[in-house]
């Protein structure tokens, strides 16, 4: 039995402000830090030995993982991968979700947020929120940096990394923890749970709540559960 643990970062500053965050680097709130520490405690209680830790390039996921590793007293350096980043929200980046609903209409914003293949307008490359203007992304080839993304785009990006980097480790009975984001975890769940394009748009991922997935030798899911049942969301699986 192999274990895969998926953790969406704890509440971020822009989660609290209801702003579209995407690839912008914002940190955790006080509540987000508490969620991350609590996630570490839940993971510690499982007594699972983690072989590899992964996070996105983004501070909120990196710091969530740091709190978890501190709780586990594990000082190993995690693998940071931009491919695990949140979905890029294009021209919506930095804007308030409620204000955009009033301006563009609730249906249009819902389509941007929850549809499978609809993407917002691209973010101008001169905008300070564009990844090309953020220092942490200078190491990424420019052709790999998006101006906007749909959930499908995010799925394609995340899954290429998962198949190339993570899947074989799981097949070799290595236990893995990934600290990432709502949409990058949604992409992983689509693949692992075999959710169709409509069903995946309904999946909600809570902040700072570890999702433990137990896999058999053929990578089939034997069991999956949120470790904090008080804040669990419907996995839409069974």
Curated annotation (Swiss-Prot):
CDD domains: HP_PGM_like (cd07067). The keyword RNA-binding does not apply. Pfam families: His_Phos_1. It catalyses: (2R)-2-phosphoglycerate = (2R)-3-phosphoglycerate. Substrate binds at residues 8-15, 21-22, 60, 86-89, 97, 113-114, 182-183. Its EC number is 5.4.2.11. The record marks 181 as: Transition state stabilizer. Pathway: Carbohydrate degradation; glycolysis; pyruvate from D-glyceraldehyde 3-phosphate: step 3/5. GO terms for biological process: gluconeogenesis; glycolytic process. GO terms for molecular function: phosphoglycerate mutase activity. Keywords: Gluconeogenesis, Glycolysis, Isomerase. The active site is at 9 (tele-phosphohistidine intermediate), 86 (proton donor/acceptor). SUPFAM superfamilies: Phosphoglycerate mutase-like. InterPro entries: His_Pase_superF_clade-1, His_PPase_superfam, PG/BPGM_mutase_AS, Phosphogly_mut1. Catalyzes the interconversion of 2-phosphoglycerate and 3-phosphoglycerate. Belongs to the phosphoglycerate mutase family. BPG-dependent PGAM subfamily. PANTHER family: PHOSPHOGLYCERATE MUTASE. Homodimer. This is 2,3-bisphosphoglycerate-dependent phosphoglycerate mutase.
